[in-house]
A protein has these predicted regions:
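Alpha/beta-hydrolase superfamily serine-hydrolase fold, recognizing
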Residues: 1-204
Length: 204
């Protein structure tokens, strides 16, 4: 099963190369890529930053984007055009990479979310971001992670049960697209989710 998932991941990465040829990056966006949000040199601990041109002097609301892919595949590049369009609407956007199952656990992925959030908390003001308006956006598996991360942020009980230290960054709203919310192990993705865990029990 693990080999099958790794093959799907490899096929996805190849499809992204072809996809890149079909789309043109929107004009009017300042784009910086592969910024490390942790000091461990893990290639998964990187993010991209998007800011609209012509608004360098303005303080902008902040979006942190968490890509989808069923927790097993995907990358920040897949949401490149989506994030650029969000930026053109007047947002400072950070699009983060995170470790993928089965190379890590679901709770490791949440730790990555909080590492990226701490990075944003530390750097957003210098990047022209408004920390009083921070939004967490995710699709599919990214929406699932964003939901659990937000629950942990707002409940010491859930954070303790998860064994995950939340970020000090306050999130003011979630933007969830086609969220993946599995609570059983009756599908191939669910095989890698905890069969029974206090955090899941609290939220289901």
């Amino acid at each position: 099963m693990e080999k099958q998932f790794l093959k799907q991941r490899s096929d996805f990465e190849k499809s992204c190369v072809e996809r890149e040829k079909k789309y043109h990056f929107p004009q009017g966006v300042i784009f910086e890529t592969d910024i490390a949000y942790a000091k461990d040199k893990n290639k998964a601990h990187r993010l991209d930053r998007y800011r609209p041109k012509g608004k360098e002097a303005q303080i902008l609301p902040v979006i942190i984007n968490v890509h989808g892919g069923g927790l097993l595949l995907g990358n920040k590049e897949f949401n490149k055009y989506f994030c650029a369009l969000l930026s053109k609407k007047g947002f400072l956007v950070y699009s983060m990479e995170y470790r993928l199952i089965p190379d890590c656990t679901f709770f490791d992925q949440l730790r990555d979310i909080f590492l990226a959030m701490d990075f944003v908390k530390e750097h957003a003001a210098a990047d022209g971001g408004d920390l009083s308006h921070v939004y967490l956006v995710g699709d599919s598996g990214g929406a699932c992670l964003a939901t659990y991360a937000n629950a942990i942020q707002n409940s010491k009980k859930i954070a303790k049960a998860a064994g995950v230290k939340p970020s000090g960054l306050k999130v003011h709203a979630l933007g969830l697209i086609s969220g993946m919310f599995y609570t059983t192990k009756f599908d191939k993705i669910g095989l890698f989710l905890p069969e029974s865990h206090a955090v899941i029990d609290m939220l289901t």
